[in-house]
């Protein structure tokens, strides 16, 4: 991934003129200074007030990014609802965003405000490598997540059995290795001592082939993969929803089957937030199942007692004795406690009823859990689609304008301030994922509240 620091340097050069070591004057991956030029800092391009304002805004962005992504990591590792193996991808993605905010953004801000590189040649190479690695890993993570979503939709049973935490962790390691393979070789193989500049600069290779290959390999190709995968996911989910609605789901007045907020269709029996919906009228809720069982058992015992009392009443009637309702009721209680054949029959029938009800509850609970899992999978797919869409929207302006610069150079170069805005919007993406999780996912929202307010209440108690 081409470093946004290069975009900053290009924008500074465009604004400062030919003496500012612009893109055409810089080489790749190093700190430059003119052989006979002064090493003193250049005249600042921002006023003191502008420097303070930009530092405050970017400082808030850094803190917000770190806090939000730390909350994501804590939520996934501590919340039972978020402990699914696939959420480890979000932990790794949040870690990359935290590293961007702590190891890249502060130096990009300093480079922008000072208009030259202050931190030396060694850290310039480290900074460029980390910048490219973290930003590339973000989009490779999203590609891996999209493939995970695709396999979980098309091979639900088989893939979910194979998707263990160990396999997910191995995939995450592979994602970081792929990102390193994409990021580091250009920084190492293309290093050369750059030409003279008015003051130290830190930037990547400026050759056309490198700009285009880095943009394609680090952004446009992964975006194409993600788009195709999610289009396939949508088609498969839509086809399954239509099939299920034709077989089982009731059709509304307008002929449309009920769907969830993500358009993928709701699993039957799954509530809005993935919890089991209340059962139909002829099926009692789980919380009253014990009371229902007791009522059925008492009814069975009463019926057995009445049958026995009726038999005894018939014999007594022959002797001139009748059996009223009280006797029948008494017989029911006696039958339920007596060791005779009738009592044994009543106890056996109550055991059979209890066994039947327990099997029915277990089956209903299993179906409920399966539908909850399906609903959560759909919500997770939708949230990740939003994450990918926001990522593309944030980074597309930078990569598009950067590619244009690589093709036609100054003829296609956008104004310097606009170019700076584009690459800082890309950095802002690192702070948006926690916001997306909070807005679109109730499990994350509940977990964030639990983490923040539980600790606050503990502080008040102490």
UniProtKB/Swiss-Prot annotation:
GO terms for biological process: adrenergic receptor signaling pathway; cell-cell signaling; G protein-coupled receptor signaling pathway; negative regulation of epinephrine secretion; negative regulation of insulin secretion; negative regulation of norepinephrine secretion; platelet activation; positive regulation of MAPK cascade. GO terms for molecular function: alpha-2A adrenergic receptor binding; alpha2-adrenergic receptor activity; epinephrine binding; guanyl-nucleotide exchange factor activity; protein heterodimerization activity; protein homodimerization activity. The keyword Ribosomal protein does not apply. Glycans are attached at residues 19, 33. The chain crosses the membrane at residues 52-76, 89-114, 125-147, 169-191, 208-231, 380-407, 421-441. Residues 1-51, 115-124, 192-207, 408-420 are extracellular. InterPro entries: ADR_fam, ADRA2C_rcpt, GPCR_Rhodpsn, GPCR_Rhodpsn_7TM. Keywords: Cell membrane, Disulfide bond, G-protein coupled receptor, Glycoprotein, Membrane, Receptor, Transducer, Transmembrane, Transmembrane helix. Residues 294-308 have a biased composition (Basic residues). The record marks 131 as: Implicated in ligand binding. Pfam families: 7tm_1. The record marks 214, 218 as: Implicated in catechol agonist binding and receptor activation. Residues 311-325 have a biased composition (Gly residues). The keyword Glycoprotein applies. It is found in: Cell membrane. GO terms for cellular component: cytoplasm; endosome; plasma membrane. Disulfide bonds join 124-202. Alpha-2 adrenergic receptors mediate the catecholamine-induced inhibition of adenylate cyclase through the action of G proteins. Belongs to the G-protein coupled receptor 1 family. Adrenergic receptor subfamily. ADRA2C sub-subfamily. This is Alpha-2C adrenergic receptor. It comes from Homo sapiens (Human).
């Amino acid at each position: 991934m081409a470093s946004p620091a290069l975009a900053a340097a290009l924008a500074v050069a465009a604004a400062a003129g030919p003496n500012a070591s612009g893109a055409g004057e810089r080489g790749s991956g190093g700190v430059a200074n003119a052989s006979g030029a002064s090493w003193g800092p250049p005249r600042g391009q921002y006023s003191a007030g502008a420097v303070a304002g930009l530092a405050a805004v970017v400082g808030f962005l850094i803190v917000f990014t770190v806090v939000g992504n730390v909350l994501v990591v804590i939520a996934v590792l501590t919340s039972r609802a978020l402990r699914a193996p696939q959420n480890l991808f979000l932990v790794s993605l949040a870690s990359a965003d935290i590293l961007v905010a702590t190891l890249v953004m502060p130096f990009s801000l300093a480079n922008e405000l000072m208009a030259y590189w202050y931190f030396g040649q060694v850290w310039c190479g480290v900074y460029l490598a980390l910048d490219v690695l973290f930003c590339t890993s973000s989009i490779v993570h999203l590609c891996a997540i999209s493939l995970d979503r695709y396999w979980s939709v098309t091979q639900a049973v088989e893939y979910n059995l194979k998707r263990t935490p160990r396999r997910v962790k191995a995939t995450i390691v592979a994602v970081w290795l792929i990102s390193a393979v994409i990021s580091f070789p250009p920084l190492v193989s293309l290093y050369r001592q750059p030409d003279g500049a008015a003051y130290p600069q830190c930037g990547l290779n400026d050759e056309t082939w490198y700009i285009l290959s880095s943009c394609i390999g680090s952004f446009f190709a992964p975006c194409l993969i993600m788009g195709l995968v999610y289009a396939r996911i949508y088609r498969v989910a839509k086809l399954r929803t239509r099939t299920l609605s034709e077989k089982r789901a009731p059709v509304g007045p307008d002929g449309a089957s009920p769907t969830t907020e993500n358009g993928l269709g709701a699993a039957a029996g799954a509530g809005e937030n993935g919890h089991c919906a209340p059962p139909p009228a002829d099926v009692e809720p789980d919380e009253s199942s014990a009371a229902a069982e007791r009522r059925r058992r008492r009814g069975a015992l009463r019926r057995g007692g009445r049958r026995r009392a009726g038999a005894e009443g018939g014999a007594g009637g022959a002797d001139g004795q009748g059996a009223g309702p009280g006797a029948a009721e008494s017989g029911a209680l006696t039958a339920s406690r007596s060791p005779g054949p009738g009592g044994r029959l009543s106890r056996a029938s109550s055991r059979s009823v209890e066994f039947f009800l327990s099997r029915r509850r277990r089956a209903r609970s299993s179906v409920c859990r399966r539908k909850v899992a399906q609903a959560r999978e759909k919500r997770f797919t939708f949230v990740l689609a939003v994450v990918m869409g926001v990522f593309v929207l944030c980074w597309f302006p930078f990569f598009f304008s950067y590619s244009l610069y690589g093709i036609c150079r100054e003829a296609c170069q956008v104004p310097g301030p606009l170019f700076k805005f584009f690459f800082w919007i890309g950095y802002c993406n690192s702070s948006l994922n926690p916001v997306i999780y909070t807005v679109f996912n109730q499990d994350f929202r509940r977990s964030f509240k639990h983490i923040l307010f539980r600790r606050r209440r503990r502080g008040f108690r102490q």
